[in-house]
Curated annotation (Swiss-Prot):
Keywords for this protein: Cleavage on pair of basic residues, Disulfide bond, Ion channel impairing toxin, Knottin, Secreted, Signal, Toxin
Protein name from the UniProt record: U16-barytoxin-Tl1a
Localization of this protein: Secreted
Domain remarks: The presence of a 'disulfide through disulfide knot' structurally defines this protein as a knottin.
UniProt propeptide residues: 21-74
UniProt organism field: Trittame loki
Disulfide bridge partners, by residue number: 75-90, 82-95, 89-110
InterPro entries from the UniProt entry: Toxin_22
Protein family per UniProt: Belongs to the neurotoxin 14 (magi-1) family. 06 (ICK-Trit) subfamily.
Listed GO CC annotations: extracellular region
Signal peptide region: 1-20
Main subcellular localisation: secreted
Tissue-by-tissue expression: Expressed by the venom gland.
Known function: Ion channel inhibitor.
């Protein structure tokens, strides 16, 4: 019987002091969760800022690529039609009417300039 009374008194004391600690623990949990949400919010804001910076860099790179793709076409090589409707001849070649192709296709061709 003495043992049961001791265990019951310990149970009552543990219940009483356990509730007091539980209230303190709940306050600590609230503080921790509020701090975590603040940190998460700040981390999220930093991530959004970083994302905006990356998008700006990406758009700048795409503009450069678009500029590269829209460059003028390459020059025409030897025995290729040239003129107003065609690309210019490469360096070292001139756009001339030739006997071989010009009379048939009615357009000048890129040829090596004649010295004469």
């Amino acid at each position: 019987m003495k043992t049961i009374i001791v265990f019951l008194s310990l149970l009552v004391l543990a219940t009483k002091f356990g509730d007091a600690k539980e209230g303190v623990n709940q306050e600590q949990k609230k503080e921790v969760t509020q701090n975590e949400f603040r940190v998460e919010y700040l981390n999220e804001m930093a991530a959004m800022s970083l994302l905006q910076q990356l998008e700006a860099i990406e758009s700048a790179l795409f503009e450069k690529e678009a500029g590269r793709n829209s460059r003028q076409k390459r020059c025409n090589g030897k025995n290729v039609p040239c003129g107003a409707n065609h690309s210019p001849c490469c360096s070292g070649l001139s756009c001339e009417e030739t006997f071989g192709y010009g009379w048939l296709y009615k357009s000048p061709y890129c040829v090596i300039p004649s010295n004469g």
